[in-house]
């Protein structure tokens, strides 16, 4: 459902470094509505889903890593920090969330890289030739030009941005729930909040995380576009930020953010759904254990 929004976001976000846009054959997109109208006209309606299959292949493992590793990191940080104050308690979700973000980003980065390169390819094989036709084609061409290093362009900034995003995403959500309930314990799974309240804090967490980290994501995405052009075309992060702000101002770091904010609804729904599932599972385990304990006591009395 959100694939067209994701592709429009990527195109707007990276067009300052695109070799296909800003030429006599195809001008740059002025904004969200301009891109939504012109992309189907220039590349066909189904081009709005270009790169979506690869994004799906990346998305499920990423969410699995995020939620399965969150509790592991949370328990590890709790053991190392041994929190005694409210501040140290609330710090745990931020650290655990950031750590799972870096983990998933690093493991799945080649998929993220290829998804970006394929999605921002605005070629239609008529006026502009397409650069990549799939995952294998993208990897082969980038590796031939730059080696494996080319597949990891922008990893440093992307990992830093993901740490901030996930730490804010999980941290704000947890902190908001605990503040609402005025509980003394920071354990996310030991408290229950109304569904609408959980959705509100999840959406708030997604929006805040996006506003904070979007410039870092923009720089990382544009860094990805330098791969495949030869090592001589590589640009430092400092020079890239200077080029973007010099040409478009600070606003250039936030191009495409409106489309990104529209997709945050899905992120908040996933977080709340995961919370509900884990709560029900813990209740089920607790009831089952209590039932087994009662049966054991009855058999012992006999």
Predicted features, each with a name:
Residues 1-6:
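Hydrophobic transmembrane alpha-helices of multi-pass solute transporters/permeases
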Residues 9-29, 33, 67-149, 153-156, ...:
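Flexible extramembrane linkers and terminal tails adjacent to transmembrane helices
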Residues 31-43, 50-53:
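Blade-loop segments of beta-propeller domains
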Residues 48, 63, 81-82:
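Short, flexible active-site-proximal loops enriched in glycine and acidic residues
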Residues 48-50, 153:
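Membrane-interface alpha-helices at helix entry/exit sites of multi-pass transporters
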Residues 51-59, 158-159:
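Hydrophobic alpha-helical transmembrane segments of multi-pass small-molecule transporters/permeases
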Residues 55, 59-67, 166:
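Specific transmembrane alpha-helical segments of multi-pass solute transporters/efflux pumps
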């Amino acid at each position: 459902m959100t694939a067209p929004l994701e592709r429009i976001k990527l195109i707007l976000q990276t067009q300052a470094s695109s070799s296909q846009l800003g030429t006599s054959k195809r001008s740059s997109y002025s904004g969200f509505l301009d891109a939504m109208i012109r992309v189907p006209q220039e590349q066909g309606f189904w081009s709005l889903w270009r790169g979506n299959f690869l994004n799906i292949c990346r998305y499920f493992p990423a969410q699995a890593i995020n939620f399965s590793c969150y509790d592991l990191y949370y328990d590890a940080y709790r053991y190392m920090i041994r929190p005694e104050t409210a501040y140290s308690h609330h710090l745990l979700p931020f650290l655990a969330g950031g750590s799972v973000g870096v983990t998933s980003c690093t493991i799945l980065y080649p998929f993220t890289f290829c998804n970006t390169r394929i999605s921002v390819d605005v070629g239609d094989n008529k006026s502009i030739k397409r650069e990549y036709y799939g995952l294998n084609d993208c990897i082969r061409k980038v590796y031939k030009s730059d080696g494996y290093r080319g597949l990891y362009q922008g990893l440093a900034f992307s990992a830093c941005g993901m740490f901030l995003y996930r730490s804010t995403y999980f941290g704000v959500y947890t902190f908001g729930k605990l503040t609402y309930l005025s509980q003394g314990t920071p354990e996310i799974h030991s408290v229950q909040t109304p569904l609408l309240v959980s959705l509100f804090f999840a959406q708030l967490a997604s929006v805040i995380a996006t506003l904070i980290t979007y410039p870092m994501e923009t720089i990382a995405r544009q860094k990805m576009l330098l791969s495949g052009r030869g090592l001589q075309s590589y640009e430092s992060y400092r020079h890239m930020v200077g080029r973007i702000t010099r040409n478009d101002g600070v606003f250039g770091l936030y191009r495409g953010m409106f489309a990104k904010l529209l997709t945050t609804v899905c992120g908040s729904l996933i977080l709340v759904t995961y919370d509900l599932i884990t709560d029900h599972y813990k209740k089920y385990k607790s009831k089952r254990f209590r039932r087994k304990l009662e049966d054991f006591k009855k058999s012992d009395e006999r």
